[in-house]
């Protein structure tokens, strides 16, 4: 299965039969290289990925300044140190799951809930971890 298929079929899927979808999603390498992304995934800056990686290595690094993706600031909320970073901005937010080799991004807006985004991103992330990625 191609990386793009994971994004198209597993990240940008209909969530729990609600007819709702994430706003955008991507799978990136630790260096910020794009393995696959939805057409509207934001154009991020390399230093934003560097800061996200630093937060995985040093949990809490992003808390004082916020998480930035394509210049959009998200308030960092409870995650799983070294494994998941979650951010909130108004009625939407972001979930980032770190696997052995990749970062799985899911960005959402209402009516998608934070819990639904977490479920979608972390489910595919856990699957990729189990597959050695």
Curated annotation (Swiss-Prot):
<protein>
    <recommendedName>
        <fullName>Profilin-1</fullName>
    </recommendedName>
</protein>
<dbReference type="InterPro" id="IPR048278">
    <property type="entry name" value="PFN"/>
</dbReference>
<comment type="function">
    <text>Binds to actin and affects the structure of the cytoskeleton. At high concentrations, profilin prevents the polymerization of actin, whereas it enhances it at low concentrations. By binding to PIP2, it inhibits the formation of IP3 and DG.</text>
</comment>
<dbReference type="GO" id="GO:0005856">
    <property type="term" value="C:cytoskeleton"/>
</dbReference>
<dbReference type="GO" id="GO:0003785">
    <property type="term" value="F:actin monomer binding"/>
</dbReference>
<keyword id="KW-0963">Cytoplasm</keyword>
<comment type="similarity">
    <text>Belongs to the profilin family.</text>
</comment>
<keyword id="KW-0009">Actin-binding</keyword>
<dbReference type="InterPro" id="IPR005455">
    <property type="entry name" value="PFN_euk"/>
</dbReference>
<dbReference type="InterPro" id="IPR027310">
    <property type="entry name" value="Profilin_CS"/>
</dbReference>
<dbReference type="GO" id="GO:0005938">
    <property type="term" value="C:cell cortex"/>
</dbReference>
<comment type="subunit">
    <text>Occurs in many kinds of cells as a complex with monomeric actin in a 1:1 ratio.</text>
</comment>
<dbReference type="Pfam" id="PF00235">
    <property type="entry name" value="Profilin"/>
</dbReference>
<dbReference type="InterPro" id="IPR036140">
    <property type="entry name" value="PFN_sf"/>
</dbReference>
<keyword id="KW-0206">Cytoskeleton</keyword>
């Amino acid at each position: 299965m191609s990386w793009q298929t994971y994004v198209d079929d597993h990240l940008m899927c209909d969530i729990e039969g609600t007819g709702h979808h994430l706003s955008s999603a991507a799978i990136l390498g630790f260096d910020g290289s794009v393995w696959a992304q939805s057409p509207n995934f934001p154009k991020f800056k390399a230093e934003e990925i560097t800061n996200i990686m630093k937060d995985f290595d040093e949990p809490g690094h992003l808390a004082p300044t916020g998480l930035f993706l394509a210049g959009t600031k998200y308030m960092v909320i409870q995650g799983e140190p070294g494994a998941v970073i979650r951010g909130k901005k108004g009625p939407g937010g972001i979930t980032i799951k770190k696997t052995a080799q990749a970062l799985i991004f899911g960005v959402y807006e209402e009516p998608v809930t934070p819990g639904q985004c977490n479920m979608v991103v972390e489910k595919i992330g856990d699957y990729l971890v189990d597959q050695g990625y």
